[in-house]
């Protein structure tokens, strides 16, 4: 995505408002380490496929080892997004997600960060006292084996 990359806004999430989100700006945040125990726990609870829950079977998979569920990866992304990008004082929720893709597997030991591009900011047509911020979020993987 185009835009100037910065590691922060002028304001922290504790004092960030609609006007602080500038269309075209790019921000990088993170990092969070993917822990094997958490991959196994999440897989067992929510996505019990062999390459998420069984290290030996996962070695024989196309991935060559244990990988995090895409939903686990999405949850880790959401943690970074919530901690660093979303306003803590003015966020009223989200109208949804346009697209979600998993392009690369995430392995235990990888470190994730996010790059967020502000695609659009606009006033709500139905509630003009509120703003809508459309963002493009990428998960960056350091240590990726794939």
Model-found features: residue ranges?
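Hot-dog-fold acyl-thioester-processing enzymes
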Residues: 2-96
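HotDog/MaoC-like acyl-thioester-processing domains
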Residues: 1-22, 102-146
């Amino acid at each position: 995505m185009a835009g100037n990359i910065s590691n922060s806004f002028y304001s922290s999430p504790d004092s960030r408002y609609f006007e602080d989100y500038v269309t075209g700006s790019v921000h990088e945040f993170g990092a969070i380490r993917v822990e094997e125990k958490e991959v196994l726990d999440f897989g067992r609870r929510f996505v019990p496929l062999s390459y998420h829950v069984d290290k030996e079977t996962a070695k024989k998979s196309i991935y060559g080892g244990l990988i995090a569920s895409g939903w686990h990866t999405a949850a880790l992304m959401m943690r970074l997004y919530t901690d660093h990008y979303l306003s803590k004082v003015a966020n009223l929720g989200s109208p949804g997600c346009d697209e979600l893709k998993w392009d690369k597997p995430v392995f235990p030991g990888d470190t994730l960060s996010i790059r967020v591009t502000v695609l659009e900011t606009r006033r709500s047509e139905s509630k003009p006292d509120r703003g809508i911020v459309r963002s493009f979020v990428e998960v960056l993987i350091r240590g990726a084996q794939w």
